[in-house]
Amino acid sequence: MQIVNAQDLTPLDSLYHQDSLTFGQRALLKPIQTWQHFSYGQSALNCQFEKSCSNFMVQAVLEKGVLRGTVIGTDRIVRCNSAARHYHLQNPHSKIQYDGRLVDPLEWKSEPAPGKSPLLATSLSIIPGLGRAYAGHPVDGLFSFLLVAGFAYNTYGHIKADNPIRTGINASFMTLFWLADFYGAYRTAKMVPPKFPQP
């Protein structure tokens, strides 16, 4: 029997030991659990969102499935940047928790007649980050572009070096961040209020 100090526990610790988790969920949640053990002791790594990005990812995976949940959680990681508060406060439905964290639930509220075209935003994401920029979040778009381009560059380098394992890992991350960019552009466009609100 392992004795664990209560202060060392993270929200994922008790969940990870449940029998109801699938193999895929366990495989994905283990790195998140490891991250929580590291980050929860570092005040500089406190998340500006409520739920934290790691707990948001866990919730997304459990409620939306491994693939869709991972894409949704990865979108949140991209959005957790220096412009997050500014973008959050532009949303008429935004909420701030008592401790100043940004309330960003998994189920978000879309505008019935959004001010930006979700179809165009999603289509523009063929070039990573462009759809987010079109939807009014250029900083998110820049982060998304840098992540997708960085992993694409690494993938190309590992292909040239004939390293199939690193090629596969980098290509997987490139694809994940690119899929998250499509989702994020769509989500952002759906949340943009109309320019001229209906009377």
Residue locations for each model-derived region?
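Hydrophobic alpha-helical membrane segments
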Residues: 14-199
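Bulky hydrophobic segments
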Residues: 7-14
